[in-house]
Amino acid sequence: MGGVRAGNLYGTLEMLILRGLELSGPMHGVGVADHISSRSGGLFQVEEGSLYPALHRLQAKGHVAWEWVKTEEGKRAKYYEITRSGRRAVAQELKGWISSTRAMLSLLDLSAEEVR
């Protein structure tokens, strides 16, 4: 099965970013993309052209904050962190996804165990 670009999954990229930051803590942009790829078993690939505009939208909404951090290699990297507002937003999004997933499983006559 081929990969899916997370930016092509309309309306999901921001939720995936927020959830990744919530689960793993502050990360730089490449770390966010790697987290999404790793957690999806490589199925979702986030390109820079989708990732950074999404991070900027999340920052504009107050869901993400950032700071410059000096890396082990001595370079500066922008690290993103989920805010309290971002935590509330991702909690709301997750409720919707859980509801939609249950409905899809029912429509497809599948159990949660069958899709694990």
Show which residues each predicted segment covers.
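Basic, amphipathic "hinge/linker" alpha-helix immediately C-terminal to the N-terminal HTH DNA-binding motif
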Residues: K75-L94
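Amphipathic alpha-helical dimerization/coiled-coil segments
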Residues: R88-R116
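Amphipathic alpha-helical recognition patches that constitute DNA-binding helices
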Residues: T12, L16, A77, E81, ...
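A positively charged, amphipathic N-terminal helix/segment that binds anionic biomolecules
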Residues: M1-G2, Y80
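Basic amphipathic alpha-helical segments that dock to polyanions
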Residues: L51-L58
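Short beta-strand/turn micro-motifs at beta-sheet edges
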Residues: G3-G7, W68-V69
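Beta-hairpin "wing" of winged helix-turn-helix
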Residues: Q59-R76, E81
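N-terminal helix-turn-helix DNA-binding core of bacterial DNA-binding proteins
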Residues: A6-S50
